[in-house]
Amino acid sequence: RRCFNQQSSQPQTNKSCPPGENSCYRKQWRDHRGTIIERGCGCPTVKPGIKLRCCQSEDCNN
């Protein structure tokens, strides 16, 4: 699986996930800096108030 891993509005970058990792995620939240977006491999557990979208195809988490 390959997932995007750039932060917020940085130029697109992606990486290959470890063997057996078939999910990508996109987390989004707001703080004093504005809206923060984090992308990567897997499907992490998030705290309340953080939007999480997990998906299972190549580069699906932009």
Swiss-Prot record:
Provide GO CC annotations from the record.
extracellular region
Q: Report the record's disulfide bonds.
A: C3-C24, C17-C41, C43-C54, C55-C60
Keywords, alphabetical:
Acetylcholine receptor inhibiting toxin, Disulfide bond, Ion channel impairing toxin, Neurotoxin, Postsynaptic neurotoxin, Secreted, Toxin
- Which GO molecular-function terms appear in the entry? acetylcholine receptor inhibitor activity; ion channel regulator activity; toxin activity
Task: Report residue spans for region: Disordered.
Answer: 1-21
What the protein does?
Binds to muscle nicotinic acetylcholine receptor (nAChR) and inhibit acetylcholine from binding to the receptor, thereby impairing neuromuscular transmission.
Protein name per UniProt: Short neurotoxin C
Give the species: Laticauda crockeri (Crocker's sea snake)
